[in-house]
Swiss-Prot record:
EC number(s) on file: 3.1.21.10
DNA-binding as UniProt keyword: yes
Subcellular location: Cytoplasm
Organism: Brachyspira hyodysenteriae (strain ATCC 49526 / WA1)
GO biological process: DNA recombination; DNA repair
Coiled coil regions in record: none
Protein name: Crossover junction endodeoxyribonuclease RuvC
Function: The RuvA-RuvB-RuvC complex processes Holliday junction (HJ) DNA during genetic recombination and DNA repair. Endonuclease that resolves HJ intermediates. Cleaves cruciform DNA by making single-stranded nicks across the HJ at symmetrical positions within the homologous arms, yielding a 5'-phosphate and a 3'-hydroxyl group; requires a central core of homology in the junction. The consensus cleavage sequence is 5'-(A/T)TT(C/G)-3'. Cleavage occurs on the 3'-side of the TT dinucleotide at the point of strand exchange.
Description of how the protein assembles with itself and partners: Homodimer which binds Holliday junction (HJ) DNA. The HJ becomes 2-fold symmetrical on binding to RuvC with unstacked arms; it has a different conformation from HJ DNA in complex with RuvA. In the full resolvosome a probable DNA-RuvA(4)-RuvB(12)-RuvC(2) complex forms which resolves the HJ.
Sequence similarity: Belongs to the RuvC family.
């Protein structure tokens, strides 16, 4: 089963496709969708959508998880991230991918056992769980979101 994790952003959107096999997790692909300030606003949103849509069509995830928007002190940034989340959710919906939203503290708690864990602790656990060496924050967050969702799905499936 392939799970897509997304750390939404306007300038940098982290993504990770992970595969759960038995009790192990393998990263199929992960990275960033990056937009740049010299691009028109609508082009940046379109680029996020088209890149994610291509990745979804390539890897055909069974489900997805996306980080909920937390309130930022910078309203302008929060609005841009919210709009990026909108095109991300559109890409998931048009590809018939069911998704779950997670608060950052939920992901941190599930991955590290501490809802207030820092970036270093998160990255360490992500790399431990996947046997990888991810050093980019947004990518690591996307992997963590995918891991949290895949793990939660596994628990619910075991209960059934």
């Amino acid at each position: 089963m392939i799970t897509l994790g997304i750390d939404p952003g306007f300038a940098r959107c982290g993504y990770a496709f992970i595969e759960a096999k038995n009790s192990a997790y393998k990263i199929v692909d992960s990275g960033l969708i990056e937009t740049f300030q010299n691009q028109e606003y609508n082009q940046r949103l379109s680029f996020i959508y088209t890149q994610l849509d291509e990745l979804i069509k390539k890897y055909k995830p069974n489900n997805a998880a996306i980080e909920e928007l937390f309130f930022s002190k910078n309203t302008k940034t929060a609005i841009k991230v919210a709009e990026a989340r909108g095109v991300i959710i559109l890409a998931l919906t048009l590809n018939n991918i069911e998704f779950q939203e997670y608060k950052p503290k939920e992901v941190k708690s599930q991955i590290t056992g501490n809802g207030n864990a820092n970036k270093d602790a998160m990255m360490k656990m992500v790399n431990l769980f996947t046997g990888s060496n991810i050093i980019q924050d947004d990518t690591a967050d996307a992997v963590a979101i995918a891991l949290a969702h895949a793990s939660r799905n596994r628990i619910f499936n075991d209960i059934k």
